[in-house]
Amino acid sequence: MATQSIKEYSLNFQGYWREANKGGVPSKSGIYLVYRCLYNSEQNTVGLKEIIYIGQSVDAHERIVNHDKLDEFNAKLQRGEELCYSFAEVDEEN
């Protein structure tokens, strides 16, 4: 039986994008997270509540801006929460 080696990756998620500014997600290949968050306007921070989706795309910007599961994501939000996104670049070849 042939064995297949497992490739290991280190992902660097830098920052976050709130639903209102998700257009800032780069048009690059990578892994993205969709999560429930609470935005603190006084401190300009978000508090991660729950990761609700993990995806991959050759163009994360296009995928997130036009995500076909947006209604499903919004249905998971609780009072005062909003959707937030994180992105880690991964070369297309990987």
Describe the role of every protein-language-model region.
Residues 1-66, 86, 93:
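GIY-YIG nuclease catalytic motif and its immediate N-terminal context
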Residues 60-88:
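A broadly used, surface-exposed interaction patch
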